[in-house]
C-alpha cells in the first residue's frame, strides 16, 4: 500500500524513489513489525489472561514446567497480525510470491488457531485431531506445490540445488518437485511446532533463519548477484525479503514477551504458520538443503520425536529420556535457559554455514 503511494508521489518528487529499493523496505518492514508487536503485545496478553486462554502442562514432563500452567497462549496471533499488516504496507502487492506466502502462512495459522482454540477455550485436551490437522496441512501444501510447479518459468526452477558445489543441481521434474515442496512445507511447519516447548526456543531460530532467507531471496531475485554467486535467478523473488524482514521484526518483539519467564506462549497458531512460511520461501528461492542446515535445531527436534516413537513401537524402549530433544536435556539436568541459549548458539553457527554456501562453491 505504502509502496504504491510512494511510487505515485515519486512521479513528482524523485526523492521518494528510494522506497522502490527492496533493502530499504526490508529494514522498514522489520522496524514496523517490531513496533506493531510492541504496541499491541501488552494489550493482547492482558486480553488472553482475562479470557483465561492458558496453556496446560504435561504432568509427565520436567517438574520445573508445572509453574508455566495457565500462562497465556495463542500469542502467535500477535506475530501473524504484525507480519500481515507490515507486509501489506511495505511489499509490492502485485507480486505473486508475496500473496502465495501470505496465504500459506494464514492457512497454516488457521489450522493452528483451531487446534489451540479447542484445547484452551473448549478444554478439549486433544485439540484438533491429528488426522484432521495433517489433512488440511496437506491440502494447503499440495496446492502451493502444484501452483509453483505449474508456474515455473524455466526447468531449472524446479531443480534441487546442491550447496557448496558450483552449478550442481538435481533435476526433479514436476512430480518430484511437488513431493519435495510438500515435504518441506509440512515438515518445516511441524518441526517448528515441536521445537516450541521452551521459552524463546523456537522464535529466535525462526528470526535468524528469516534474516538469512531475506538475503537468499534478495540475491535470487537479482539477476546479476544470482549469476555471480551461481544460484538460480528467480524473477520477483527478491520481494520476499520484505516479508522475511517483517517476520524477523515481529519475532524479535515476540521474544520480548516470550523470554524466560514467558508472559505468553506462541501456540500452534504461531508455530505452524511460521514453519510453513519458512518452508514455502525456501522452496521459492530453491534452497531446501540449506534450510535443513540452517534449521538444524528444528530438524533434530523433529527427528528425536520420530526416533522415539519408532523405537518404542518396534523395540519397546525409548532412545531419549523424553522427546522432543529439548526435554531430554532438561531431564539430564540442564536448566531451561541453558538448553535455549545453547540451541540458539547452534543455530547461529548453522545459519552462518548456510549463508556461506552463497560464496563457497
Swiss-Prot record:
A GO BP annotation: peptidoglycan biosynthetic process
Cofactor list: Mg(2+)
Record GO cellular component, one term: plasma membrane
InterPro entries referenced in this protein's UniProt entry, alphabetically: Glycosyl_transferase_4, PNAcMuramoyl-5peptid_Trfase, PNAcMuramoyl-5peptid_Trfase_CS
The entry's keywords: Cell cycle, Cell division, Cell inner membrane, Cell membrane, Cell shape, Cell wall biogenesis/degradation, Magnesium, Membrane, Metal-binding, Peptidoglycan synthesis, Transferase, Transmembrane, Transmembrane helix
CDD domains: GT_MraY (cd06852)
Pathway as given in its UniProt record: Cell wall biogenesis; peptidoglycan biosynthesis
Membrane spanning stretches: 28-48, 73-93, 97-117, 134-154, 168-188, 200-220, 237-257, 264-284, 289-309, 338-358
Cell compartments where the protein resides: Cell inner membrane
Main enzyme class: transferase
Membrane topology label: Multi-pass membrane protein
A molecular function GO annotation: UDP-N-acetylmuramoyl-L-alanyl-D-glutamyl-meso-2,6-diaminopimelyl-D-alanyl-D-alanine:undecaprenyl-phosphate transferase activity
EC number from the UniProt entry: 2.7.8.13
Catalytically driven reaction(s): UDP-N-acetyl-alpha-D-muramoyl-L-alanyl-gamma-D-glutamyl-meso-2,6-diaminopimeloyl-D-alanyl-D-alanine + di-trans,octa-cis-undecaprenyl phosphate = di-trans,octa-cis-undecaprenyl diphospho-N-acetyl-alpha-D-muramoyl-L-alanyl-D-glutamyl-meso-2,6-diaminopimeloyl-D-alanyl-D-alanine + UMP
Predominant cellular place of this UniProt entry's protein: membrane
Lineage: superkingdom: Bacteria
NCBIfam families found in the cross-reference section: mraY (TIGR00445)
Protein function: Catalyzes the initial step of the lipid cycle reactions in the biosynthesis of the cell wall peptidoglycan: transfers peptidoglycan precursor phospho-MurNAc-pentapeptide from UDP-MurNAc-pentapeptide onto the lipid carrier undecaprenyl phosphate, yielding undecaprenyl-pyrophosphoryl-MurNAc-pentapeptide, known as lipid I.
Record-stated family: Belongs to the glycosyltransferase 4 family. MraY subfamily.
Protein name: Phospho-N-acetylmuramoyl-pentapeptide-transferase
Source species: Nitrosomonas eutropha (strain DSM 101675 / C91 / Nm57)
Amino acid at each position: 500500500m505504502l509502496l504504491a503511494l510512494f511510487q505515485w508521489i515519486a512521479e513528482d518528487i524523485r526523492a521518494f524513489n528510494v522506497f522502490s529499493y527492496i533493502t530499504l523496505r526490508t529494514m522498514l518492514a522489520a522496524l514496523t513489525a517490531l513496533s506493531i508487536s510492541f504496541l499491541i503485545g501488552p494489550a493482547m496478553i492482558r486480553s488472553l489472561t482475562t479470557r483465561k486462554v492458558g496453556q496446560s502442562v504435561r504432568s509427565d514432563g520436567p517438574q520445573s514446567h508445572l509453574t508455566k500452567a495457565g500462562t497465556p497462549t495463542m500469542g502467535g496471533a500477535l506475530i501473524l497480525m504484525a507480519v500481515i499488516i507490515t507486509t501489506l504496507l511495505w511489499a509490492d502487492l502485485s507480486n505473486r510470491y508475496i500473496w502465495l506466502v501470505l496465504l500459506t502462512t494464514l492457512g497454516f495459522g488457521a489450522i493452528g488457531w483451531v487446534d489451540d482454540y479447542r484445547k484452551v477455550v473448549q478444554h478439549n485436551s486433544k485439540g484438533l485431531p491429528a488426522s484432521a490437522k495433517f489433512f488440511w496441512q496437506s491440502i494447503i501444501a499440495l496446492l502451493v506445490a502444484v501452483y509453483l510447479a505449474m508456474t515455473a518459468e524455466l526447468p531449472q526452477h524446479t531443480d534441487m540445488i546442491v550447496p557448496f558445489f558450483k552449478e550442481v543441481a538435481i533435476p526433479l521434474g514436476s512430480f518430484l518437485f511437488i513431493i519435495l515442496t510438500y515435504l518441506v512445507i509440512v515438515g518445516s511447519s511441524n518441526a517448528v511446532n515441536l521445537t516450541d516447548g521452551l521459552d524463546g526456543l523456537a522464535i529466535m531460530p525462526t528470526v535468524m533463519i528469516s534474516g538469512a532467507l531475506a538475503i537468499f531471496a534478495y540475491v535470487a531475485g537479482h539477476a546479476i548477484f544470482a549469476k555471480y554467486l551461481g544460484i538460480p535467478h528467480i524473477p520477483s523473488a527478491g520481494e520476499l525479503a520484505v516479508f522475511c524482514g517483517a517476520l524477523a521484526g515481529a519475532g524479535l518483539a515476540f521474544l520480548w514477551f516470550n523470554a524466560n519467564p514467558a508472559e505468553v506462549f506462541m501456540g500452534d497458531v504461531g508455530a505452524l504458520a511460521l514453519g510453513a512460511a519458512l518452508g514455502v520461501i525456501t522452496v521459492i528461492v530453491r534452497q531446501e538443503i540449506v534450510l535443513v542446515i540452517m534449521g538444524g535445531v528444528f530438524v533434530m527436534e523433529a527427528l528425536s520425536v520420530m526416533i522415539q516413537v519408532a523405537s518404542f513401537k518396534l523395540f519397546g524402549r525409548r532412545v531419549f529420556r523424553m522427546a522432543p530433544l529439548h526435554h531430554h536435556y532438561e531431564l539430564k539436568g540442564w536448566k531451561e535457559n541453558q538448553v535455549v541459549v545453547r540451541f540458539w548458539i547452534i543455530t547461529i553457527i548453522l545459519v552462518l554455514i548456510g549463508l556461506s554456501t552463497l560464496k563457497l562453491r
